[in-house]
Amino acid sequence: MQGIQQGQNKVTGIVKDNAGIPIVGATIMEKGSTNGTVSDLDGNFSLQMNSQGTILISYIGYITQEIKVDKNDKLIITLEEDTETLDEVVVVGYGAIQKRSVSTAISTVKGGKISEMPTSNISQSLVGMSSGITLQQISGEPGAAPAIRVRGAGSINSGNDPLFVIDGYPTTDAELFNNINPADIADIQILKDAASSAIYGSKAGNGVIIVTTKQGQTGKPKVSFSTQVGWSEAQNYVDVLEADDYMDMIIEARTNNGSIQNFPKLIQMRESGNYENTNWQDAIFRNALNYRGTATITGGTEILKYNFSANYQNEDGILLNSFYKRVGIKGGFEANLSKKIKLGVNFSTTYSKRRLQQPTGGNTEDVTGVIAQALSMPPILPVYQNNGDYTQIAQHYADLGLNNQLRNPVSNLLENRNDKWSIRTMSNAYFEVKPIKGLTLRTSVNFTTNAAKQDYYQSAFLLGKSYTGNKSTPDLTSIDGYRLSGFGYNAYWSTTATYDVTLKEKHHLNAMIGYDFEYNSDFEVQQDDRTDSDNPIAYNNTSITNVNGAKLWTGSSEYSNYVFDAMFARLVYDYNYKYVFSGSVRRDRSSKFGPDKRAGWFYSGSLAWNITEEDFMKDIHWLDIAKLRASYGITGNDQIGNDYAWISTISSDQNVVFGTTAIPTYYPSGYSNRQLGWEKNKQMDLGFDIGVFNALNIVVDLYKRTSDIVMPANIPNFNGIAGSVYMNAGQIENKGIEIQVSATPFKGDFSWETTLSWSKNNNKILSLANNQNQLANASAGTKWGNVMRNYVGRPMGDMYMLKVIGTFNTEKDLAQYAKNGTQDIGDLIFEDYNKDGTIDVNDYQLVGNYQPDFTFGWNNTFIYKDFDLAVTIDGQCGGNVIYAAARAFSLNRYDDNVLAESGLGRWKSSTDTGNGMSHKAGTNNLGSNIGPSTRYLYDADFLRIRNVSLGYTLPKKFCKIIGIENMRISANVQNLWTFDKYPGYSVEANYEGNSATNNGVDFGGYPISRTFTFGLNFNF
């Protein structure tokens, strides 16, 4: 750098690299301000600034320079390459490679992006952070984690969860992954294509998420503490009728069906206005307090480094009497025994307790639980009686003709105890030797345990259908309770040898071979329901109390284990970082599969061309990176749900009576298949990475994945008895495109970093077992059978129902349109799809699918001096959701309350026909109107402001005065607002929790909460 005087208040110059070539797009900022510029195509710049100021010059891949300007100068600035940036490594399976040598589809999420979010677990923090990964928050229950999908669902009967690799330990246990304290995470790598994940073979078919936790750092001890306190509330309420509108509706209904004269008290109440206006959602929901705290100490020397942390989380649920508590500790050290020998130990223990509630379930309309009860309860009734008893319709309002089967949802919440405990441990130790330059030998041992227990107890007066008991008059004839307890452990041993060498400065080679061994064991025992003649406590310490007259049903137990081992190898080669080749091969064996197909081979290959490393690109400085990638690989899926799927099973059935003696009969219910093998995924990927002007980066990936799946196939009846056998039959295809755009539009005292991710996945069933055209047993409940359908040639999760086209308004309509059984004026008209003149199940037609057209996420970080603001937005376009819970409170069903759109939009007369989707109140043909139809179908589009966080970092001068290194205070809102057109709580619904075939059906699950928190972080 040379200085030459020139005019005042203006600095000009040129930015070059160490070869003297001008750099295009270098950022030149006046320190302490937002005043800045960038260098032009010739590397020149001009900046108006204070004569005594300082400028910062930066460019990707180069070391930032800071230059003090005393006068108006003409500057010649030479930037040196940042070797640390150029040699930045990316964690991949069983090691790490230089980022420039990556030829596969990998996304990175830094730990700092998620540690400050007030979420219950890591999965919630990943929402919207990367393309190609979908996280569906199907429940707002405290501690509940979203379902994770990497590039769609590739299996029908088996699991679709990705493989989690936690500090080198591979597991499909999502709970173990979500038990990690977010503040302990250094970074997360998401391996999306087969070439990056095939090194994990049979476990990697659904993608791989690699978690690296924080380790000890050289230096004097550093202590950090963070705490967050706040509250949660229901993000939205379902809009149901208020008391006046409800009274008008049920009086109209009973007038229409001719029964109004039987309920004079109802008319008297309406005329006098002597009734409540209870919001039952207010009664069951609350503002729930939450608290999180983490303390960490880290430090060490060149010989020994350590890191210890402890965390506590107390999260009350927005439903009464629900909560999640977690306490965790983590520790580890790393010792350099010599220049060539290293030893490391890590351990963690997590204790959690959760109180569950029953938001969903099944009754005569396949909907029960406190959510459906609260939405169905008449708003004219109080929550409590004057004597403190819970209001129960059967006990207190039988003369109003209301639904006697409805229970008070508040009593169900407060009088149930359904608790789950868990103590989980994870420990690992490794020993690493570098006998010669470039060669690393490493062996590691991991051991995890899980001790769990669940106790369920329901107060006596809540049982039975008589509903005769209450607080003041308990029904002591029965109680209900059960206990589940279990213990499992997993032992894992891995040994690798890695050789990394550079030949003639241009040939870079990284080769690795290894061996894995794993043993897993699980045991569970259940003590089933009991009925007592008294009302004792259901459980006393560790055993069921024994009461005279008690009937203790038989318990059950279950034990399973499996053994697994693997051999694998990987080679990464690049020529001068221009041309990259990567290949891997792996052979797995597992006792889960038949002896004849117990071993499986998995392999991959990938190529990359770093265009910007070519000599002819050296003068193009505005182009930071341009890389083409292509890969192909085969991975597997061993999450088949049964450790003994290939073995024959025996079941018992009806007893045969000989004289007066009943003899049980046994028969084969599952047939042996020694040929049962792995689910396999074949995936191709084409990718392109580009970065320009040190400010904009774009990553695009196209992929196609074909999955050969395991599923049960029916045995022909001529074998003597019906049954099924697990076999390798059927194929699923997923193909799509992912785009991720990262930009830094502003730098300096005011900076803005933004990342937009967009993903589109198309899913299709290619074939099924026994040449079936439709997957059997896909149902959304007994009242919704054959609504969710899965056909060959179609995506999973098609929705078939009757299509509502209006209401019968006149006698002419009754004569013109086909009827669904008996129907009258004011009932719904359904489309006669097959034109046979009758409405029945044969008129079900394709009306939607749960899978979205595309998903997106948008992350923004704004920094102005010591203030920072982070905003995360995510959502989806396309797809549908069935609001099945609404059937339980359909218009005029037992005079329960209803959705406002149905109640206020109901048919009233031939001149007031309502919204065309709601029949008249008091119809005598209720069953003909409330079956599966498009009246329950809604678009699943949504845009959610997922996270907003505002922080302030105190000035170092102030921190020094109070004796700390730094301090940050923050305020955060999680799930601030959701924009959608859905009347339920959330469109992210799933009938079977994690199902790929029965998704998109909402039975009134636990609502997602809006959470406000205030945080404090400081370091010593």
Tell what function each PLM region has.
Residues 239-241, 457-460, 527-531, 874-877, ...:
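Short Gly/aromatic-enriched secondary-structure transition segments
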Residues 114, 119, 160-161, 291, ...:
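Extracellular/periplasmic, surface-exposed regions of secreted and cell-surface proteins
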Residues 269, 464-466, 549, 876-968, ...:
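Extracytoplasmic gating/loop element in the C-terminal half of outer-membrane beta-barrel translocons
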Residues 849-882:
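Glycine-rich, aromatic-lined ligand/substrate-binding cores of catalytic
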Residues 1-330, 334-350, 359-364, 410, ...:
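Short, small/polar-rich motifs associated with maturation and membrane association
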Residues 224-274, 526-530, 727, 746-849, ...:
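Conserved small-residue
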